[in-house]
Design a protein with these regions (language model features):
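A short glycine-rich, His/Asp/Glu-containing loop-to-beta-strand
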Residues: 1-36, 43, 94-99
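Ligand-binding loop in jelly-roll beta-barrel domains
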Residues: 7, 75-100
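Glycine- and acidic-residue-biased ligand/ion/polar-headgroup-sensing regions
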Residues: 41-58
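Short acidic-glycine-tyrosine-enriched beta hairpin
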Residues: 59-75
Length: 100
């Protein structure tokens, strides 16, 4: 679901059965990913490099993250990532354990 149109994903390290998967994302202006809920015992961490992204957790908590902001949450919570602006956003995301 996170490979929707308008999102470019680049792995930052070769995937070799690591416990953590870091990648760089570029999200087009106005793009919104489908809401997902991953298996229990998973975590995600986001750090915004440029632009603004919006992360909604469990439909009732919305966080607007700008350059230099970070967020960490359990992937078992329903979550959605969006770029609500007219500018491209870039950010680093880490997932543990990895899931592509």
């Amino acid at each position: 679901p996170w490979m929707d149109t308008g999102v470019e994903v680049v792995l930052l390290t070769p995937y070799r059965d690591w416990q953590m998967l870091p990648f760089h994302r570029t999200m087009a202006a106005g793009e919104k990913l489908a809401a997902v809920r991953l298996e229990a015992a998973r975590e995600e961490w986001y750090y915004v490099l440029t632009g603004t992204i919006e992360i909604t957790l469990t439909s009732d908590e919305c966080f607007v993250l700008e350059e230099g902001d970070a967020i960490h949450f359990e992937s078992s919570r329903l979550h959605q990532v969006a770029n609500p602006t007219k500018q491209t956003a870039t950010f680093i995301c880490m997932m543990t354990p990895p899931q592509l």
